[in-house]
Amino acid sequence: PTSLAHLVTENLHTLGVDEFHLVGNSLGGWICLEMAASYPENVKSITALAPAGLWLTPFTSRYPGEVALRFMASGVEKLAPSALNYTWAKKIGFETVSPRWRELSYELCLDATNAMAGSTGYFPAWDALLGKRFDKQITASIPTTIIFGDSDHTLPFKTCQERSLAPIHAKWIVLPQTGHVPMWDSPNEVTSEIMSTTGVIK
């Protein structure tokens, strides 16, 4: 996560973007936190959606559920366009990710399946975070909002949502009927919090 934070920041500087609001989900949320810790003069706000890294005891091996989902996606990529028309297939793929899996659109499910199947960097990225957690300080001058869902089975409350590791000034929100991808389950609420955190609305 730290090296990715440096890489993203370097790429933004190359593009001439020196100040930015950050929004990221899961590993992306962790990267946002790392960027703010390392480049406080550049980061204007953070909205971290179910960020990884907020665990007291870091993972030492690949999370079994994530391994299963990755292999499942790889195995059904060619079948997905037809299979996802059926409720049973949608349930297998998305029930653990979203409590509102029935409401997810066909297009979203297909895109997510194809993205997972084609993500050659998935396991290298996962392996790179083993034994690590987010444990840095972020200045209180950077508005920070952390959003988790109450039904996040990927980063569950008991082990992966440690508030003591979050910036002390962070606004911490738990959305109802929401899983590991809050922008899927609660898009209006997530959008509202992003706008509030960035200062677009008060």
Name what the model sees in each region.
Residues P1-L27, F59, S192:
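Active-site loop/oxyanion-hole signature of alpha/beta-hydrolase fold enzymes
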Residues H13-E19, P40-E41, S141-I142, H169:
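Active-site acidic short loop of glycosyltransferases
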Residues G28, C32-A36:
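Short helix immediately C-terminal to the catalytic nucleophile in hydrolase catalytic domains
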Residues A37, K44-E77:
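Flexible "cap/lid" loop of the alpha/beta hydrolase fold
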Residues P81-I138:
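Conserved alpha/beta-hydrolase catalytic His-Asp/Glu region
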Residues G118-L165:
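Conserved serine/cysteine hydrolase catalytic core
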Residues T154, L175-T191:
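Catalytic histidine-centered segment of alpha/beta-hydrolase-like enzymes
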